[in-house]
Structure formats: structure tokens, C-alpha cells
């Protein structure tokens, strides 16, 4: 993880750690001109590692976004942001996306009253996300909510931290995406691969 954030910059979904400043690194004199391919590859890797996707999963999302109406890059980010594991991370119910994925796969999370154990489940507007009634599930979520820094919640989500309940109000607006990324470079990367 640390090698990834050192190379790609801050990835809030992967870890809360921050890369050191440039003066602390071992070899600050190695400033090589980056090729266009490398820039596109780094943007793709940022997206992949932030959301914790495999290469095949990201490629599938790019194909789905390409077939949808609208800007491919914007649709791609909306698809990734509406994944259940990412929604849990954004609500503050998990400290990282891998932590949220573990909550989902261990069957602690309900969507609209039904257990969902697939982290890539695509949430829709008006979905209600809650925890199981078991004490262990509630304790896990309570610890995450208490320990997470209270950042501003995106306007497409609302949380009731006393009932351990989150609500998806609408599809995310692009300005609320918490990752500094140029999604067009990711789309370009894949368009040049085929």
C-alpha cells in the first residue's frame, strides 16, 4: 500500500496514510519526463487502487460506461461511486474501501432489508443501507463511525448514525468525488489498448 501511495499520491479509499513530501524521498534528483502513456497508466492505476478493483473489473466498467449515454468518464465515475463498498466508505461506516468490502462479504450489511454480500452491488437512489440487528454488526459499525474523521458527507447520501442507517438520495454529482483524477485519461488508456 505504501509503495502505491508513494507512486500515485493520496488514495483515500485504500488507506488514510499520506505520502511524504518530495524532499523526504530517497532520490529527489530523479525527475524524468513522463511519457503520455505513463501519465494515462498512472491515472488508471489511481482509479484501480482507490476502488480496489482488478484490471478485468475496471475494464468491464469502462465497457459499460462506453455504451451508456453521456460522457464515458463521468458515467464510469458514477458507476464506481455507486458500488455498495464505496457507499459504505463514503457514509463513514468503514475506514477504507477494503474494510467496507469485508463488512459486506461477512454479511453485516442489509440493503432495503435484505442481506447483500456482494461488494460490487450497484446501489440505486432511495436505497436504504442498514446493519444487521446482531450486536456484533452494530458494534463494528459503531466503532467505525466513532473513529472516522467527520468529513462533509456528499449531498447524494444521508446517514443516521444512531440507527446505523444510510440513505442514497440520488446519483452522485461529479464534484463530490473524493479523488483527484482525470477520468478522460483512463478512458483514453483503454481506447488505445483495443
Swiss-Prot record:
Locations listed in the record: Plastid, Chloroplast
List the coiled-coil residues.
none
Identify the keywords attached in UniProt to this record, alphabetized.
Chloroplast, Plastid, Ribonucleoprotein, Ribosomal protein, RNA-binding, rRNA-binding
Q: Where in the numbering of this chain does the S4 RNA-binding domain appear?
A: 82-143
Q: Chief subcellular site?
A: plastid
Q: Where is this region: Disordered?
A: 1-29
Which Gene3D superfamilies does the entry link to?
A: Ribosomal Protein S4 Delta 41, Chain A, domain 1, RNA-binding S4 domain
List the PROSITE patterns hit by this protein, alphabetically.
RIBOSOMAL_S4, S4
Asked if the record carries the keyword Signal, the reply is no
GO biological process per UniProt: ribosomal small subunit biogenesis; translation
GO molecular function terms attached to this record = rRNA binding; structural constituent of ribosome
- GO terms for CC? chloroplast; small ribosomal subunit
Q: What does this protein do?
A: One of the primary rRNA binding proteins, it binds directly to 16S rRNA where it nucleates assembly of the body of the 30S subunit. With S5 and S12 plays an important role in translational accuracy.
PANTHER family hit by this protein: 30S 40S RIBOSOMAL PROTEIN, SMALL RIBOSOMAL SUBUNIT PROTEIN US4M
Q: Which NCBIfam families match?
A: PRK05327.1 (NF003717), rpsD_bact (TIGR01017)
What HAMAP family has UniProt attached to this entry?
Ribosomal_uS4_B (MF_01306_B)
Q: Which family does it belong to?
A: Belongs to the universal ribosomal protein uS4 family.
Subunit structure, briefly?
Part of the 30S ribosomal subunit. Contacts protein S5. The interaction surface between S4 and S5 is involved in control of translational fidelity.
Return the protein name.
Answer: Small ribosomal subunit protein uS4c
Instruction: Supply the source organism for this entry.
Output: Furcraea foetida (Mauritius hemp)
**Taxonomic placement:** Eukaryota, Viridiplantae, Streptophyta, Embryophyta, Tracheophyta
| Encoding gene per record | rps4
Amino acid at each position: 500500500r505504501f509503495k502505491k501511495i508513494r507512486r500515485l499520491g493520496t488514495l483515500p479509499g485504500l488507506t488514510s496514510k499520506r505520502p511524504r513530501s518530495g524532499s523526504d524521498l530517497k532520490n529527489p534528483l530523479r525527475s524524468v519526463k513522463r511519457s503520455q502513456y505513463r501519465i494515462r497508466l498512472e491515472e488508471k492505476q489511481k482509479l484501480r487502487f482507490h476502488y480496489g478493483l482488478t484490471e478485468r473489473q475496471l475494464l468491464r466498467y469502462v465497457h459499460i460506461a462506453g455504451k451508456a449515454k453521456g460522457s464515458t468518464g463521468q458515467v464510469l465515475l458514477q458507476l464506481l461511486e455507486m458500488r455498495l463498498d464505496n457507499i459504505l466508505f463514503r457514509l463513514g461506516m468503514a475506514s477504507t474501501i477494503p474494510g467496507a468490502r469485508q463488512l459486506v462479504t461477512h454479511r453485516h450489511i442489509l440493503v432495503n432489508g435484505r442481506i447483500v454480500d456482494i461488494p460490487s452491488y450497484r446501489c440505486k437512489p432511495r436505497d436504504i443501507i442498514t446493519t444487521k440487528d446482531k450486536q456484533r454488526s452494530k458494534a463494528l459499525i459503531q466503532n467505525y463511525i466513532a473513529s472516522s474523521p467527520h468529513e462533509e458527507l456528499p449531498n447524494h447520501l444521508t446517514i443516521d448514525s444512531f440507527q446505523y442507517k444510510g440513505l442514497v438520495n440520488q446519483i452522485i454529482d461529479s464534484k463530490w468525488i473524493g479523488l483527484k483524477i482525470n477520468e478522460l485519461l483512463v478512458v483514453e488508456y483503454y481506447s488505445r489498448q483495443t
